[in-house]
């Protein structure tokens, strides 16, 4: 199969859908891989690295879409890409069709075959392609929250973990799923006083088994959340 890797052009998206090592794996299995010029540069991968892996470099996004039988992306095509997707072409990416009617209609009109990573379910009922994104989101939320606690960002001017003689920040995490679990672990690792709320008592019991001592679990109710929001320094 002819596989195309276009450069991501959505605002603030710096990732690339296939690493040079991934390209090498595909080439060794008999596939042809075309990568747009500088597609991987913002992720630290040069064109030369892809060429050494056996991939071919194409100068433009139009060339990649026009050549490939299967397009592999990170994020959904933006409006300028709609016309590049052609009938029968396979497009693998995170689409999130439910929140974007224009994108959905454009892909239907193109008659392409779309595989939305976020809908892939394994035999255990898990979402193996969505979980890594959720792990990143949970951990990043704490980093961003810590930044907005700084005075220059309009915050209280406190550290998540405090310092000797000063209490740590109180962090509230709503939901004990993948995002919430990773947010709680990240905040706890920085020394914060963390409370994680969820509506599932079985899930709260699971969290109690492996969370560090500075993480408390609490049933998610309107009353509990109202009280915690009033006293928390940060909420994820």
Question: Residue locations for each model-derived region?
Answer:
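Short beta->alpha connector loops at strand-helix junctions that form conserved
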Residues: 36-37, 60-61, 94-96, 116-121, ...
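Short gly/pro/ser/thr-enriched loop/turn and capping motifs at secondary-structure boundaries
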Residues: 41-43, 99-101, 121-125, 202-204, ...
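Conserved small/polar residues in nucleotide/adenosyl-binding loops
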Residues: 230-236
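Generic secondary-structure signature for well-ordered alpha-helical cores
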Residues: 28-32, 55-56, 70-73, 109-113, ...
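Glycine-rich phosphate/diphosphate-binding loop of Rossmann-like nucleotide-binding domains
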Residues: 13-28, 34-36, 159-229
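An N-terminal-biased, well-structured beta-alpha scaffold segment characteristic
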Residues: 2-106, 110
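Glycine/serine-rich phosphate-binding loop and adjoining beta1-alpha1 elements at the start
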Residues: 8, 82-169
């Amino acid at each position: 199969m002819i596989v195309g890797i276009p450069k991501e052009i959505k605002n603030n998206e710096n990732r690339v859908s296939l690493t040079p090592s991934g390209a090498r794996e595909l080439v060794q299995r008999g596939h042809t891989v075309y990568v747009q010029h500088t597609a991987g540069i913002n992720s630290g991968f040069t064109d030369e690295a892809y060429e050494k892996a056996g991939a071919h470099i194409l100068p433009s996004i139009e060339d990649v879409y026009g050549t490939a039988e299967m397009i592999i992306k990170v994020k959904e095509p933006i409006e300028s890409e709609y016309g590049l997707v052609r009938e029968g072409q396979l497009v693998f990416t995170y689409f999130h069709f439910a929140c974007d009617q224009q994108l959905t209609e454009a892909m239907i009109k193109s008659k392409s075959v779309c595989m939305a990573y976020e809908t892939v379910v394994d035999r255990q009922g898990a979402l193996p392609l969505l979980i890594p994104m959720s792990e990143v989101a949970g951990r990043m939320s704490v980093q961003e929250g810590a930044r907005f606690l700084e005075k220059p960002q309009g915050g209280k001017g406190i550290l998540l973990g405090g310092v000797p003689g000063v209490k740590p920040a109180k962090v509230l995490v709503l939901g004990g799923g993948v995002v919430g679990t990773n947010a709680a672990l990240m905040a706890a690792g920085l020394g914060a006083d963390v409370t994680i709320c969820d509506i599932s008592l079985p899930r709260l019991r699971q969290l109690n088994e492996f969370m560090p001592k500075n993480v408390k679990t609490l049933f998610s109710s309107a009353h509990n959340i109202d009280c915690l929001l009033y006293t928390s320094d940060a909420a994820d």
